[in-house]
Amino acid sequence: MVFDIEMIKKVYSSMKDKVDHAKKICNHPLTLSEKILYSHLWNNLDKPFLRGVDYVDFAPDRIACQDATAQMALLQFMQAGKSKVAVPTTVHCDHLIQARIGAGPDLQEAINTSNEVFNFLESVSNKYGIGFWKPGAGIIHQVVLENYAFPGGMMIGTDSHTVNAGGLGMVAIGVGGADAVDVMAGMAWELKFPKLIGVKLTGKLSGWTAAKDVILKVAGILTVKGGTGAIIEYFGPGAENLSCTGKGTICNMGAEVGATTSTFGYDKSMEKYLRATGRDEIADEANKIKDYLTGDPEVYENPEKYFDQVIEINLSELEPHINGPFSPDIATPVSKMAETLEKNNWPRKIEWGLIGSCTNSSYEDLSRASSIADQALNKNLSTKAFFGINPGSEQVRYTAERDGFLDIFEKLDAKVFTNACGPCIGQWAREGADKQEKNSIIHSFNRNFAKRADGNPNTHAFVASPEIVAAIAISGDLGFNPETDSLVNNLGKEVKLEEPTGWELPPKGFEVDDRGYIEPDEDGSNVEVVINPESKRLEKLEPFVPWDGKNITGAKLLIKAFGKCTTDHISMAGPWLRYRGHLDNISNNCLIGAVNAYNKKTNFIKSQLNGEYGGVPEIQREYKKNNISTVVVGDHNYGEGSSREHAAMEPRHLGVRVVIVKSFARIHETNLKKQGMLALTFDNESDYDLIQEDDTFNFIDLKNFSSGNQITIELVHSDGSKDIIKTNHTYNSQQIEWYREGSALNLIKKGA
């Protein structure tokens, strides 16, 4: 048994009393989100919390880490002076496997090239009581859904798509490694009490429309920052008509609208999924308190009264969507895609169709996509685009192979890649990508930022459901509408694809030979963790220097980032994943994807030391060598995307002191705070335009740093003229202590 049934029983045994107490204190019916939040408080509840205002300490039930972020998280935990993790924790090896040839060869290549890292993660897991999932076992969030997620629980994970577990009724939140280390060390986890967005679903999906289309539609409504600081709670009769893995897909892409997390109330589809994945005991326990595992009826009857925002979607009227390119919130119904392509001059020919990722790699996803592939074979159609599949877990892969789905894909010349993230995170050796030709691909993933999948800035990536991806790949035409259009087959006949079919769960049940799980030793005190001092992949961490309590003066502008600046721009993935455990080496990718506002180029900035232009990391290292502080300036939603704390640790390691932006993405702002950085926002957004390429920053009143106060900055321009700007921050007293001590980890060590 990989899940902790005693922990789950403990959560359920206290949930009723905690929720009843919260209803009395709050004096109103509760949403599901509030029930889970209030039943996971670190301290006793004596007053209701203000949404979007109050910082609250929580006690999550478990933690999940993937291999790219786990390296830095565990390197930090090793410094915390603890002998074992305080809550159930798992590590999943899914990020360090590149898609190139196919499942077997690619997995072996990953083991050959990253064995040092895998061995490190396995030994650290064994030493500190952490469950370990081997390379090839599956994608973290699919494995969590199959084994660990449970209705009414709270978990955190060092990956932004941890939110996927909301499909099984959890409040599951992506965090940086330093947040995870707090909880591993037995401390509370802090979060600003979220606002609540309610999405009422009516009707029922049919035809070509899938659960993916719900979140593609929501992304178009909310945009990439519309969910920031909020939990999205789905409810209504339409929600009950969705499968559990379909709910997971919807929650997964809540990360793309900036939501803290998303969730659904416990229902029959969740019970069926729990039982199908061998967790009857959890289903039985959940059924005993099922009224506490969903929102109160009064809330759903009058949602405008209890949610900060309400969206309503009729599933019976919802069209299939294709979102993109370059941003997951550019939502286009399939019926409008042809005219939209022409209007925007996007490449119409599809080069690749990719199915998988943590968003859409379930048994249901593969079964529905394979029904389209099977039709193509039966109707004498060939795929006009290359086709790739990443199953979500070994359990899904094994069962899908048994039931003939993989054979169907392979007969259509699809490549079946390893049970891993692969192309979704840039782990894709795509042939010809280095030519940087303008082209289009379509995938069932979650993100489609420039260069993310294949490193080519001219690849237009579009997001859709697995069944639409299959249809578009077969047609080779992004403007193809399978609901209305026909195709000409290999015999010259006009044929039409019929609506997809499939199974929510395998009729013959799930089956797996070796799921890839390694249980840790009961006592890991004798387990030795070795890091080679000459390693290029792993490096022991040195503590960051505490603040000296003085104003920062004479700081130089490093880069003023123009437009979208995601964590992919700040700390690229792809080939850089190999250095995720070596802070100094991975810092050589710091901000190399950010666009310089002064010349619109990437990784090409001016040095104020000599007036010459060069790469961001190289110039920043020179500033550090000369003991010169630097400032990074950015636009809206700075740091959106991945939870990777490297995007905060790299600039901190290289000597950047401050980041000033119009607005932050939630996880990145927290990561900056945790690493002892100063994260500020412009009081007047137009002050962004005042900042010039040769500016020097003098912080006038930083020495009075306190909760709620503004920080005043003097900008000194190269001609000697000056501007005074005001900036805001969201640091509370605890977070100011992180800044004073140099990092949150320094504070943990101080109290150990």
Residue ranges, per PLM feature:
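Mobile "lid/hinge" segments at catalytic clefts and subdomain interfaces of large enzymes
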Residues: F3-D4, D67, F150-D284, L381, ...
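Long, structured ligand/cofactor-binding scaffold of large enzymes
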Residues: I8-V11, M15, D20-K195, H569, ...
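Extracellular/luminal Protease-associated
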Residues: F235-E240, K624-F664
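Flexible inter-domain linker/hinge segments
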Residues: I5, K16-H21, I36-W42, D46, ...
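Accessory "access/gating" subregions that flank catalytic or transport cores
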Residues: Q108-N112, V117, E122-G157, E233-G236, ...
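Conserved, function-defining core regions and hallmark residues within catalytic/recognition domains
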Residues: V512-I628, V632-V633
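Acidic, glycine-rich flexible loop/linker segments
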Residues: L487-E504, H668-W738, L745-I748
